[in-house]
Structures are given as structure tokens and as C-alpha cells.
């Protein structure tokens, strides 16, 4: 338990931010799973939209500091390469 008002506030903020960050990570993982599933199924119709959505989610996570920018770039690069190889 925090002894100072400011410490209590920081604890509340930490809980809220953790929830937001976990939600963002979850959306990134879900988008990644959908994209990988489409790549493995060779679903060429859904692939461009899923890749666009995945890239968007990953860059939003990187922009807000949930994941590192290098990690985001690596994920996008690898999955883009896999997606283009299925065509």
C-alpha cells in the first residue's frame, strides 16, 4: 500500500496502463495468428487485407511503446515475405 498520494496515483495508473498494453498485445497476437493461418491455407483473397491489418496493429503497438520498433519491423518483414511467397 502506498504511503503518499502521488504513489497511490502512480499505482492506479500502472494498473490501467498494464490493462491497455495487454489488450494491445493481444490484438497484435490475434492479427498475427489470422495472417499465419491465411498464409498456410493460401487464402489469396483475404491475405492483403489481413497483412494490412496486421501491419497497422503492430505499428500502433510500436508507436505506443508496447513492443520495440525493431521487433515490429522484424515481424512485419518476415510475415510480408511469407505472404508474398504464397502468391
From Swiss-Prot:
GO CC term, one of those recorded: small ribosomal subunit
Biased composition (Basic residues): 1-15
Lineage: Bacteria, Pseudomonadati, Bdellovibrionota, Bdellovibrionia, Bdellovibrionales
Keyword set includes Ribonucleoprotein: yes
Amino acid composition bias (Polar residues), ranges on this chain: 19-29
UniProt-listed GO biological process terms: translation
Domain of life: Bacteria
Coiled-coil ranges from the UniProt annotation: none
GO MF, one example: small ribosomal subunit rRNA binding
Signal peptide: none
Cited Pfam families: Ribosomal_S20p
SUPFAM superfamilies reported for this sequence: Ribosomal protein S20
Organism: Bdellovibrio bacteriovorus (strain ATCC 15356 / DSM 50701 / NCIMB 9529 / HD100)
Alphabetical UniProt keywords: Ribonucleoprotein, Ribosomal protein, RNA-binding, rRNA-binding
Protein name, UniProt field: Small ribosomal subunit protein bS20
The family this protein is said to belong to: Belongs to the bacterial ribosomal protein bS20 family.
Gene: rpsT
Task of the protein: Binds directly to 16S ribosomal RNA.
